[in-house]
Regions:
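Active-site-proximal beta-strand/loop segments in catalytic clefts of secreted hydrolases
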Residues: 95-98, 132-136, 159-161, 205-209, ...
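His/Asp/Glu-enriched short active-site or ligand-binding loop at hydrolase and phosphoryl-transfer sites
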Residues: 210-211, 215-251, 286-295
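Acidic-and-aromatic substrate-binding clefts and catalytic sites of carbohydrate-active enzymes
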Residues: 101, 109-110, 133-142, 205-212, ...
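Extracytoplasmic/secreted proteins, especially bacterial periplasmic and envelope-associated proteins
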Residues: 90, 113-117, 140-143, 180-190, ...
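Catalytic grooves of carbohydrate-active enzymes
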Residues: 253-292
Length: 297
C-alpha cells in the first residue's frame, strides 16, 4: 500500500468514526421532554394521541396503523427523543445499521458492516428492537435485511440511503441539499422493499444525529417522524463491553431510547454489551419495546 493510499484510507476511517460517534452523541442540543416535537427551535408539545400513518406511506407492508407524531410548526418534520412515562417502565433499544454509499470496496475486501450475532442474541433474549438501516446496508446484505424485516420482533426504520449529512458541518460527512435529501430517504425505502423487508416503519434517524430546521423542512415531503435518542451507549469503536453496558444502565429512564450500532467492524462489542444490559434492566423491572410502541403511548 502506498503512503497516499494509506492516508486516504485513514482519513476515510476517521470520518466514519466521527460520524458513528456522532450518531451516539447528538448535536449538542439538550434533550426535550417527550412526547414533544423538536424542530431545532423551542419545542412544541405534541397532542396527547399520536396519529397513525396512512396506508401507502413508505412503511407499506408493515402493520396497518403505525403511530407517528403530527407535523411541527409550519409543517416541519417532528422529532421524537423519548416517551414521557409515569408508571410503565419501558425502554427501546435501537441499532444503527450503518454503511455509507462509498464503502462497497471495503465490504468487497472483507470488512463487515453487519452483525448477525447481535441479531441472533436479540432473538434469543426475546428483545424487540428498532433497526435504523441505511439503504446501502440493505443492498449489501439483502438476505439479512429481509430476515430482520420479516421478523415481528423487529422493525426497520430509515437511516438514509447514503449516510450523508442533512446538515453541515456534521463530523466531516458529505452534505445533501434539500431535494437530494428527500430522494436519499426515498431511495432507502426502495432498497428495503427490494430486499423484501416487510416490517418497515416511517421513522428516520439523521446520519450523525445532525439536523436543524432546514433539514427538518427538507425531510417533510417524506412524511416521517425523526427519531433521536436520550441514552448514548458509546459503543462506536468501543473495546470494553462492560463500559458500554455501564453507560447504558446509568442513563436509562422509563421511556428511554438507547442508540447503539449493528455494524461489526465499527462497533465490535455491542452484542456482548447487550447481553449484559438486558438481564440487568429486566431485573430493574423494565420491559423492552420497539420505538413504535413508545411513540404510540
Amino acid at each position: 500500500m502506498t503512503l497516499s493510499v494509506a492516508v486516504r484510507k485513514a482519513a476515510a476511517t476517521a470520518v466514519l468514526g466521527a460520524a458513528l460517534a456522532g450518531c451516539g452523541g447528538g448535536t449538542g442540543s439538550s434533550p426535550k421532554p417527550a412526547n414533544e416535537i423538536r424542530t431545532g427551535s423551542p419545542a412544541v408539545p405534541a397532542p396527547a394521541s399520536p396519529s397513525a400513518a396512512p396506508s401507502g406511506s413508505p412503511q407499506a407492508g408493515a402493520p396497518a396503523r403505525v403511530p407517528v407524531l403530527p407535523p411541527g410548526p409550519n409543517g416541519l418534520t417532528p422529532v421524537f427523543e423519548r416517551a414521557k412515562q409515569h408508571g410503565d417502565k419501558t425502554v427501546a433499544l435501537t441499532f444503527d445499521a450503518d454503511m455509507t454509499s462509498d464503502q462497497g470496496p471495503r465490504a468487497a475486501s472483507g470488512e463487515r458492516f453487519d452483525n448477525p450475532q447481535l441479531i441472533s442474541s436479540l432473538r434469543a433474549l426475546k428483545v424487540p428492537a428498532t433497526i435504523f438501516m441505511t439503504g446501502r446496508w440493505a443492498e449489501e446484505y439483502p438476505d439479512q435485511a429481509k430476515a430482520i424485516g420479516s421478523d415481528p420482533n423487529f422493525e426497520i426504520a430509515n437511516h438514509s440511503y447514503s449516510h450523508h449529512a442533512f446538515k453541515s458541518p456534521c463530523y466531516g460527512l458529505p452534505a445533501l441539499d434539500g431535494a437530494a435529501a428527500t430522494a436519499d430517504v426515498d431511495r432507502a425505502f426502495a432498497a428495503f422493499r427490494k430486499a423484501g423487508a416487510v416490517n418497515t416503519v416511517p421513522y428516520f434517524r439523521f446520519p450523525g444525529g445532525c439536523y436543524d430546521d432546514q433539514a427538518l423542512r427538507a425531510l417533510s415531503p417524506a412524511k416521517v417522524t425523526a427519531v433521536q435518542w436520550d441514552v448514548v451507549s458509546g459503543d462506536a469503536f468501543a473495546k470494553d463491553p462492560d463500559a458500554v453496558a455501564e453507560q447504558v444502565l446509568a442513563g436509562v429512564k422509563p421511556g428511554s431510547v438507547v442508540v447503539m450500532h449493528c455494524t461489526r467492524s465499527a462497533a465490535p462489542v455491542t452484542e456482548q454489551a447487550v447481553r449484559k444490559v438486558v438481564p440487568e434492566l429486566r431485573k430493574r423491572g423494565y420491559r423492552f419495546v420497539k420505538v413504535s410502541e413508545l411513540i404510540g403511548k
